[in-house]
Amino acid sequence: MALRGFCSADGSDPLWDWNVTWYTSNPDFTKCFQNTVLVWVPCFYLWACFPFYFLYLSRHDRGYIQMTLLNKTKTALGFLLWIVCWADLFYSFWERSRGIFLAPVFLVSPTLLGITMLLATFLIQLERRKGVQSSGIMLTFWLVALLCALAILRSKIMTALKEDVQVDLFRDMTFYVYFSLVLIQLVLSCFSDRSPLFSETIHDPNPCPESSASFLSRITFWWITGLIVRGYRQPLEGSDLWSLNKEDTSEQVVPVLVKNWKKECAKTRKQPVKVVYSSKDPAQPKDSSKVDANEEVEALIVKSPQKEWNPSLFKVLYKTFGPYFLMSFFFKAIHDLMMFSGPEILKLLINFVNDTKAPDWQGYFYTALLFVAACLQTLVLHQYFHICFVSGMRIKTAVIGAVYRKALVITNAARKSSTVGEIVNLMSVDAQRFMDLATYINMIWSAPLQVILALYLLWRNLGPPILAGVAVMVLMVPVNAVMAMKTKTYQVAHMKSKDNRIKLMNEILNGIKVLKLYAWELAFKDKVLAIRQEELKVLKKSAYLAAVGTFTWVCTPFLVALCTFAVYVTIDKNNVLDAQKAFVSLALFNILRFPLNILPMVISSIVQASVSLKRLRIFLSHEELEPDSIERRPVKDGGDTNSITVRNATFTWARSDPPTLNGITFSIPEGALVAVVGQVGCGKSSLLSALLAEMDKVEGHVALKGSVAYVPQQAWIQNDSLQENILFGCQLEEPYYRSVIQACALLPDLEILPSGDRTEIGEKGVNLSGGQKQRVSLARAVYCNADIYLFDDPLSAVDAHVGKHIFENVIGPKGMLKNKTRILVTHSMSYLPQVDVIIVMSGGKISEMGSYQELLARDGAFAEFLRTYASAEQEQDPEDNGVTGVSGPGKEAKQMENGMLVTDSAGKQLQRQLSSSSSYSGDVSRQHNSTAELQKDGAKKEETWKLMEADKAQTGQVKLSVYWDYMKAIGLFISFLSIFLFICNHVAALASNYWLSLWTDDPIVNGTQEHTKVRLSVYGALGISQGIAVFGYSMAVSIGGILASRCLHVDLLHSILRSPMSFFERTPSGNLVNRFSKELDTVDSMIPEVIKMFMGSLFNVIGACIVILLATPIAAIIIPPLGLIYFFVQRFYVASSRQLKRLESVSRSPVYSHFNETLLGVSVIRAFEEQERFIHQSDLKVDENQKAYYPSIVANRWLAVRLECVGNCIVLFAALFAVISRHSLSAGLVGLSVSYSLQVTTYLNWLVRMSSEMETNIVAVERLKEYSETEKEAPWQIQETAPPSNWPQVGRVEFRNYCLRYREDLDFVLRHINVTINGGEKVGIVGRTGAGKSSLTLGLFRINESAEGEIIIDGINIARIGLHDLRFKITIIPQDPVLFSGSLRMNLDPFSQYSDEEVWTSLELAHLKGFVSALPDKLDHECAEGGENLSVGQRQLVCLARALLRKTKILVLDEATAAVDLETDDLIQSTIRTQFEDCTVLTIAHRLNTIMDYTRVIVLDKGEIQEYGAPSDLLQQRGLFYNMARDAGLV
């Protein structure tokens, strides 16, 4: 050899000698090999890594690490190693100078090693300067150097022990020093250095230890052990969780996706970049078909007419996350190659057992090789998984962030096509699909690679017969393809049904109070169940398909093996199936099983993700609002004195619709107060929306000068403290804040709220009255100190005296905003004389414009309307003249001059009380208000008072009762049948493999085996029986899962609908939506699959242990201890894993709640230009959720590494005992034992993963059961006490000593109410805010049950009858008109009790017949979500039509005509008088004018009746009622 002269002077030392290294009982390497290869390998490794590592470090500077003792020691040791290496070199030169001839290797190797040690020392310092705390490159270098040195050390020790060998003392001593220093360097490299200077983790109160963990800690996931130990000792809480790594936060991830999406959109459309997330330009070109886009969202699967216009979201995701994700390719490729080391070593091991002359050390060497290969495979595999899961987490974060940002800027038309339910599904289900895909997508190339490698090795082992197996696999490809296509179809249908169900559930939860008041729960329950039935039909088809899929996937590897063995033994009698061929092939078939099984799952996952990808792309491509359509000028712009200029502008809500506003032209000077008036639906609110750029400008010019504040018609309140709602992101300036509170009449409210302005308002302002919500909304606008104020009827929901106070102190000529430009949409005529300009709207156009006096002098439509209406009212109600004390036209004129129109018609001035407590939800606050007033000493104002309950995480182990509940939901027969079929399957599998081992041990006679046909037939029969059992259990589990899912959903839905209102008032809707979306999806899709995999893994592990014990009984010594370690590690892990899953579920709800809240208030957020703040809040909530998710995925890896090490130990001992017992074992048993042990690692890993998955997913059942077992309201029907069908006939209502409280720990909000209302009487209920007005109504409907006393209606105590029996017989027209998506007819008559004629009659009486008749679909007109395609006034009229249709003896009105114009108001009042003439009418009135002609009035204060009598009598008493009338300007 060429190296002989290089290694020794006489050429006697070869590089390699088989007789020295292999064919010997005492193996060693040659001296030449030791001095060259073992020295050069670490050097070549470091020099090969250096250029790439240097480049990486130069681009990734994490900061500067100060010199530490660790760093100084490593550097010093590096120099010492250099000195030691070159000491050898100088010694060689010294020897040469003495005439001793040395081979060149003694000069080259020390030189190379010395330079390498200098390089290593340089890298140690470079890493320090670049902030690397622990280096994998250097640790690997020292490990390789040590392993190479270890082989040399063994050789030197063995040489030294020989007596007749001469020892080179100096070189031996330097080597021992070198070995010791390398060992110390390796140990030091296992530790991590301190954090770099200026590192962000220094300022983080709870940083993730991963960034400062050592390389060894990172690859073994040791750094999370502390958290797992803490979780084992006590349940983990949110405060225990670490901050996210910076690269995983929304702040880092989302902007990159946003930027790449913009580029892709621009590139695809071949036009300038359209900003998708920053509300600059529309996402689609103006000439694109918006209708097509909407249809696509609805159908989800229709093809785009112009494919070239569709940007590729997949490309964007790949560009954003690809670079990091590509590392997983590297790890996966290494793992796939290493997978085949097991069967190859198994072949060597079987050959070793068969070769009785082979030295024992070879068996131990193979055993060690098998163990090391398995351990390396474990570490590589879980680095791969870690990268995949982190990538998935980042994708989910980015998708949620992108969807949230898009939702802030899409047009109103796009909002209608993408409902809240669909958008929530994009954030929950679809984002989860991307996460799942990240884990599996590499299998697209990895599975075929594994199949090719396995087939290659099988060909080497068995030859051409393997083609029979290939044929079977090829036949299965079209079967899998058909199933994948079918799966996609079912997936699309399933997602559509799920969207519809979530959308409807969202509406039900938002309008639950209305459902309860109308007793409509059953109708809507049936609607949900009908959608759910369709969903379950699709799920059932998917389950059958999955069962067929499982059957083919499990049977395919066996069929491949059977066909291959059958062809092998039949084509040639001399082909003997010995242990090596059978079990190496079987090991390869087992490897083949995974890619063949996983590929259909991957295809399914890709199919699901492609559906989600399309849905997401359609949503992100929606049209956006164009804020640039309105010119925004700074206040300092002195060129124009007008604050608002609109010239010939036309606006529409959707480009496909006709314009809503036509030819609008007006200018408003700075500081002017402008009123906008007109009938319902004439475009008043649309005008404000147009100024806010909420509408699509078709033509014209709009310019605004300065900042804008907006008070919407329906007050939007956040689930936050009252103070935060007012500040709305601004800094607190105490004096100004106090003046705003006072001007908005909130001071009295702060005094009675439990924690003052720190009181948490609750979701949608649940514990504030309508008036309080509107005043908070107003205060928010005032506090922001804008230049232009847009008020959409802000005084509608407040009492007359409060309205007067607000107008005088805030909006009016002398108010806080007197120098600001104000536009006030109003129906109240009383304020018009004080405004500068009045804009009169009619049919989407400005019909008149001018000051109050100018419009009267012009004698146009406006003046005619005022005169006609006033005189008509006077003629209608002459008795009111006596009340007010003045009569005739003179009075009207005088009041007009004074700016107050206070005749009875003025009393019925149109106010919109839309915001007043979402269908009475605000009355909880009235309870708290009066309670606090009665118990002022009880309120602790230091702490924020909270009404809403956060989603709580359960702690501890999931109770067995949860599993039992799930089994009962499946059905006990199906449950036990599934277990039986699982056992049958695995018994058949064990029997077939044992039979194969017996077959391989059959004696060979004349070059062939006897009984081959019998062996083959039995082997085939066992395989077929296994397949039948697989199909059986798969069907049983799938059907059982659907039965359980149906049962749990019905229980949850029924329970939620049966819960009292107090439950909804304290439970955020996000929690409930989460249950019906994510948790139910887990029960639908995840749990059945997890059960199948858990049961399979459990029986596989048991089977493997049985086989190993049968083959090598000595393994009984080691398997129990390993089992204990396994059990301990698993218990250790599950305690933390379970709690992390719960924390993740709990932190997910606020993401949805915040998102829902944002969608409801998106116009306010945009008006105040607070998008960035809300985006930041959303990002923080998503990060908070990922803070719990990230440790859970790392904990999974932590567990898997440790358990696979236990599995690797089983492999080690199975092989070791086989080597020890090789003389007493047959090759067949060794093959069976080791091939099963090779699978144990995978089985153990899957078993623990599936057991933890089972426990973490069963949490979904626990969380569904949690809300299925909440408190319930009284029964809906009680047969024994059901009232007669014609009850109540008279309508007499008696309150006898009636007391009401909202919770046991609170005081009464109604105290000892004793009053009798005779049938047919019209009774008004008045009182200040918090007096208990609405509480009385809630008591009447038994929304809250009485604490003491009773209510008697026509002689029947209402507490003794069913709630529906009561609520069907009483009708309410609520303050807030709530409509549901569906037909108009359904909104009027969900039970279809009435004929079309009766419905049309009710519409006619409600003055809606003309409007509905003009609609294309008439009664089948589809109402949008929340009735958004009807004006607020029209929605209120629909509520009136409901009441007219029901025509019950008792009618409750809560300012029912607040949102209609004066003319319609008059018509409605007369309808109520005529149609409900013989009915008992109770009216809660903020405005006393509406009840002046009533029979009697109840005056409430602090929950007690203070006055009761006819209005005229109460005025004469000059008490509370008189004072209220005086404040309202009635006396």
UniProtKB/Swiss-Prot annotation:
Glycosylated residues in this chain: N19, N1006
GO cellular component, one term: basolateral plasma membrane
Comp. bias intervals (Polar residues): 922-933
Domain ABC transmembrane type-1: 325-608, 975-1256
Region (Disordered): 871-893, 917-938
UniProt binding sites for ATP 1: G678, Q679, V680, G681, C682, G683, K684, S685
Annotated ATP 2 binding sites: G1327, R1328, T1329, G1330, A1331, G1332, K1333, S1334
Topological region Extracellular: 1-33, 96-100, 155-172, 338-363, 462-464, 569-590, 989-1025, 1111, 1225-1226
The protein's enzyme class: translocase
Subcellular location: Cell membrane; Basolateral cell membrane
PANTHER family: ATP-BINDING CASSETTE SUB-FAMILY C, MULTIDRUG RESISTANCE-ASSOCIATED PROTEIN 1
Similarity remark: Belongs to the ABC transporter superfamily. ABCC family. Conjugate transporter (TC 3.A.1.208) subfamily.
Identification of the protein by name: Multidrug resistance-associated protein 1
Organism: Macaca fascicularis (Crab-eating macaque)
Gene: ABCC1
